[in-house]
Amino acid sequence: GVDPYSASKSSTEIMVRAYRESFFKKTNRIAVSTGRAGNVIGGGDWSPKRLIPDCIKSLRLNKTIFIRNPKFNRPWQLVLEPLKGYLMLALKQYQEPLKYSGAWNFGTKPNSVTDVKTLVNHIINFWGSGKIKIKKNNFYEQQNLQLNIKKAEKYLKWKPTYNIKNSVKMTVEWYFRVLQNKEDPKKVTSDQIDRYIHDS
């Protein structure tokens, strides 16, 4: 992308590649890689000015959800998806450092990219209530973002497990159980990890 956010990601990749090729590749002992995820969602994110936490906060207070750029497409994915990929990559790098050093993407399948409004509608549906209002956006952002995951699929045998609806369902369920049902966050997280391992 040409926006500052996308350019910062590209700059990081260029710098890491330069150091890898200049100082680490010939040693064949230290694996240096970058792993990029899509737009991760999941329970336990309390950061301000982020879509999911803001939605949950509004829903709990029975307030309208304000969104920018409703038609912008993002590769939303449950946070457990790329974490599984990172662990698989770490194991392969330990076994064969030179072969698996490089840049890796752990995103969604091309047909799973979803726009902001659709994502928020899924959140409202699984929560059980809620309203949306479009808010004017004064910041430039890339309209469509997507990661090519073919390399991870081919060489790591990694692939996404959940579609967008299942990812949102798991996310909303975490917040609902913790915030509404007052369940232990650690227990809820453990339950979801077990379910994800079973499903994948």
Give the location of each predicted region.
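Flexible, glycine-rich beta-alpha linker
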Residues: 1-4, 25-51, 73, 105
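Active-site Tyr-X1-5-Lys
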Residues: 2-33, 56-61
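Conserved donor sugar-nucleotide recognition element shared by glycan-biosynthetic enzymes
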Residues: 4, 12, 48, 116, ...
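A generic local structural motif
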Residues: 19, 52-53, 131-133
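C-terminal substrate-binding subdomain of Rossmann-fold SDR/epimerase-dehydratase oxidoreductases
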Residues: 39, 59-200
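Glycine-rich, phosphate-binding/catalytic loops in enzymes
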Residues: 50-53, 122-124
